Amino acid sequence: MPAKFVRTLVATLLFAAIAVPAHAQWKPTKPITIIVPWAAGGSTDQVTRVTAAEIEKALGQKVIIVNQPGASGSIGTKNALEAPKDGYTWTAGAAQDLGTYAVLGMLDTKIGDWALFLNVANVSTLSVNPATPYKSATELVDAMKAKPGAISVATAGVNSSGHSAMEAIAKATGVKYKHVTYDGGNPAVVATVAGETEATSQLTVEQAEMIRGKKLRPLAVIGDKPVELDGFGMIEPLTKWLPTFKAPANYFGIFVPKGVPPEVIATLEKIWANEIAKSTALKQYATSRGAQFAPYAGADAQKAVFPAVQANAWSAADTGKAKVAPDTLGIPRP
């Protein structure tokens, strides 16, 4: 084969490889729906609305938030999963839930069935109604030990962030508590403020305004790092009293089911790198609410969320709540 022909062929192939993009830019022609599977006003609803506004600007298309609470988030998530795979229906929430719905027998899906676009990492705070006598995490834990199953704790339901956090405390201390569930973090927090329950273990972002207004007394961040809450001050971590306590970060974000056109995912990944990662609005949200700004996508997002998936799944298994063994779903014990 003549050398000149070979050089021409190679040059042509190289040009073709460079000229053809991996995926075309997605330009939506109608509004996008994000199903928030929790009640309005909760942590998922709050941060999703901030994120949706940034996506609207980047895409030049309306993003509609639809709240569909119920069954610990599985109803709205199922509706997003079963929607047409045209890229116009997403969901949002805590990424750990996607990895544990199947463990709990609530929904046949795994974390790998979704493209993850994270915005913040949240931690829970153990707080009480100010009318209760508890002034520290130790006092509340001691009371739970003295009165097993009597002290009520409000959460957004089984498998919610607040429930997972409280189960981690129960596992570490051996306490039993009365679990009272609500359709979302905000209703759970309001219930504790109203005196329907004595305590809540919901996310700090959901409690922030009530803590600032002295309508809730925060006892400890359910983690190993303190939280500096604007307008209040420092909330000490639970590890101050329980040094060996562990609770992985709980990442929140927007989730797109696999099977949508690849250009949808590629466009969102570009938006996350160029817009969301630089979002002043999201950074301010995180700072004011005691959250961590965490704009991860792709493989980085999957890697970040897996420790929480493991912890949540095996907590369910160890407490007898799991319907399916986590290791059969590709979730090894941490």
Regions found by a protein language model. Give the residues of each.
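Short coil/turn segments
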Residues: 41, 95, 129-134, 156-160, ...
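Hinge/capping helix and adjacent helix->loop/strand transition within the periplasmic-binding protein
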Residues: 26-29, 55-57, 79-89, 101-187, ...
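Bacterial N-terminal signal peptides that target proteins for export
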Residues: 1-10
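Mature extracytoplasmic/periplasmic domains
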Residues: 277, 281-305
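C-terminal lobe and pocket-closing loops
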Residues: 207-279, 324-334
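Sec/Tat signal peptide C-region and signal peptidase I cleavage site
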Residues: 18-24
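Amphipathic terminal alpha-helices
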Residues: 308-321
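N-terminal (or domain-start) structured segment
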Residues: 24-111, 150, 158, 173-206, ...
